[in-house]
Amino acid sequence: MVLSMAAFATADSMIKVSSNFLPGSEILTFMGIGGFSVFSMACVAKGIPLISKRILHPAVIARGASEIIATCGFLMALTLLDFSVASAILQVAPLIVTLGAAILLRETVSWRRWSAVVIGFVGVLIILNPAGINENVFEANPTGAILAIVGVTGLAGRDLATRFIPRDVPNVQAATWGFAVVIIAGGLLSLFGKPWVIPSFITMIYIITLVIFACVGYFTITAAMRIGDVSAVAPFRYTRIVFAFILSVAIFDERLTLRILIGACIIVAAGIYVWLRETKRAIPLQSNA
């Protein structure tokens, strides 16, 4: 799980680096084509058909739509915001999943978990700093702040939709078509964004690195969920923010302000608390099953 989070953080950093040379729509399209190619080969190697009626399941379609929102929103946020800020906001996704499960799925959420969700959003506000103390992210870059929130909401929607995907839909097949919708997203963005450019050799290296680490992240997180106990490995998702902060300093020469660190710690603490409460709630249910 830790390796997968390091891979995803590295992939995110390559998106931001590439955005200095290519428009976002072009990055999305290259990423989608690369990921689709890798996972298509994985499907063929495992004897899994690329096309089947299963990919038309409403949950798979909903996951694809959420993937478009998440990818477009977060990619554009990465191009506009500091890497550390965008990565910290990303950590609130599990809290939005809890919120969505309560509202859309009618799951029972205790007041303790509700409190943790609210506290987590307070952490986001501390990072964005709408009050304008020292640095107001909303005022400096309102589009980037909004896109980050849109992106993380899309990620939460993707996770919620994944819960309803039938078990007979292989993960690798779902991932293949997940990257396919990223290609579609890139095409749609190209209609409204900057014109494409011919990438240089070094830019293609960035794109290839992005695809490699994105695929490594997916394969390793899938392995972690299958090999280890989900309740045991899930908290290690938050190591992603550690790697993101290291990369933000090492690659982008960003300064980690106390405000960003405090906000990120609050979000992570709230997320881990929600996970602990959900784990305790699941134990009695398993005992009664």
Task: Please report, for each region that a protein language model flagged, where it lies by residue.
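Cytoplasmic-side transmembrane-helix entry/capping segments in multi-pass membrane proteins
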Residues: 1, 54-64, 109-122, 141-145, ...
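Hydrophobic/small/kink-forming positions within alpha-helical transmembrane segments
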Residues: 5-10, 40, 64-72, 95-99, ...
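Glycine-/small-residue-enriched transmembrane alpha-helix faces in small-molecule transporters
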Residues: 1-26, 137-164, 287-289
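Membrane-interface interhelical linkers
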Residues: 1-6, 20, 36-62, 135-140, ...
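C-terminal transmembrane-helix exit sites in multi-pass transporters
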Residues: 76, 94-118, 242-261
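Helix-helix packing/entry segments at the starts of transmembrane helices
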Residues: 86-92, 165-181, 218-249
